């Protein structure tokens, strides 16, 4: 797509790569899949990412957001224009220590985020094993869990709001909404109305069929649209969607106090089945994590 490459190089200051070697580096991730992308762009700002997506839309090219490439099911490979968020879109945009929350760009790496939060006695507790490379944007797209999800939950439980670009270029704020759609920002209001209608119409089906498990990371979070005791948070619809619904530009996170003293308990069992059967009783003690070795 020569027109796509020409426009990207002319209108962006970020890195634009269309040579075979560069594209080959983005043709795979932590999975065994390999798909050569159309090209790669590493925007220097969110505004440049917006522009790159607009150019791709005008040239008829699909867009694939990419973070650290740690996905194990091929989520970050495809015949698309890859937008690499990890190289430059990695800042903390706002930090509110008193309210224990921060807003970040999608390409910030989890370990880098926690390194900066540590001086304030805070951390982001979705501590996945690839924390040295995984980005917050990718973790949100994947609804990552981490080894301490029994205590802290998944990404869905720790994301407050998301600002994202829709396919038509609309920049919208996805967050908690009450019963009055007038409180929803104008660009998102028609879409919010449709989403709430889906939740209300399919509430019984969703309630009956969605698995009642905490670490559910497959499929769209349609259950987030079902009316209940708490306000609906539209950001939860984007979480776990693998970037198929929108391109995240700002992610507001709920932070937790740093862990204090910790202790490790080791239990020995005579068989694998005995260990598995005991897990349900151990969980009732509310440990931070349980691991089978």
Descriptions of predicted regions:
Residues 1-58, 68-100, 129, 152, ...:
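N-terminal flexible segment immediately upstream of the FAD-binding catalytic core
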Residues 3-10, 15, 271, 284-293:
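Non-catalytic terminal accessory/regulatory regions of metabolic enzymes
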Residues 8-9, 56, 63, 117, ...:
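A generic structural signal for well-ordered alpha-helical segments
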Residues 22-25, 71-74, 130-137, 219, ...:
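A glycine-rich phosphate-binding loop feature that marks nucleotide/adenosyl-phosphate handling sites
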Residues 41, 83, 162-164, 267, ...:
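Preference for bulky hydrophobic residues occupying beta-strand positions
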Residues 63, 265, 288-290:
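Hydrophobic faces of well-ordered beta-strands that scaffold small-molecule active sites
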Residues 92-93, 104-286:
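FAD-binding subdomain of flavoenzyme oxidoreductases
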């Amino acid at each position: 797509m020569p027109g796509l490459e020409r426009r990207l190089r002319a209108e962006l200051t970020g890195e634009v790569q269309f040579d075979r070697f560069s594209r080959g580096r983005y043709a795979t991730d932590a999975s065994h899949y390999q798909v050569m992308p159309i090209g790669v762009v590493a925007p220097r700002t969110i505004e440049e990412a917006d522009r790159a997506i607009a150019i791709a839309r005008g040239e008829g090219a699909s867009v694939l957001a990419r973070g650290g490439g740690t996905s194990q099911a091929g989520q970050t490979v495809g015949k698309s224009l890859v937008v690499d968020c990890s190289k430059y879109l990695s800042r903390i945009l706002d930090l509110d220590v008193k309210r224990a929350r921060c807003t970040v760009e999608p390409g910030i790496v989890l370990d880098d985020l926690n390194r900066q939060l540590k001086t304030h006695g805070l951390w982001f507790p979705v501590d996945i094993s690839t924390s040295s490379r995984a980005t917050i944007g990718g973790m949100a797209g994947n609804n990552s869990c981490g080894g301490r999800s029994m205590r802290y939950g998944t990404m869905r439980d720790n994301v407050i709001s998301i600002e994202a670009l829709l396919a038509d270029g609309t920049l919208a704020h996805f967050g908690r909404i009450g019963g009055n759609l007038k409180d929803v920002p104008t660009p998102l209001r028609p879409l919010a109305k449709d989403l709430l209608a889906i939740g209300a119409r399919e509430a019984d089906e969703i309630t009956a069929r969605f698995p009642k498990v905490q670490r559910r990371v497959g499929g769209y979070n349609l259950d987030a649209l079902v009316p209940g005791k708490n306000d609906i948070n539209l950001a939860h619809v984007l979480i776990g969607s693998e970037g198929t619904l929108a391109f995240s530009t700002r992610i507001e996170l709920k932070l937790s106090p740093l862990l204090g003293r910790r202790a490790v308990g080791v239990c020995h069992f005579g068989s694998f089945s005995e260990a598995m059967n005991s897990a349900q009783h151990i969980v009732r003690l509310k440990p931070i994590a349980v691991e089978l070795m």
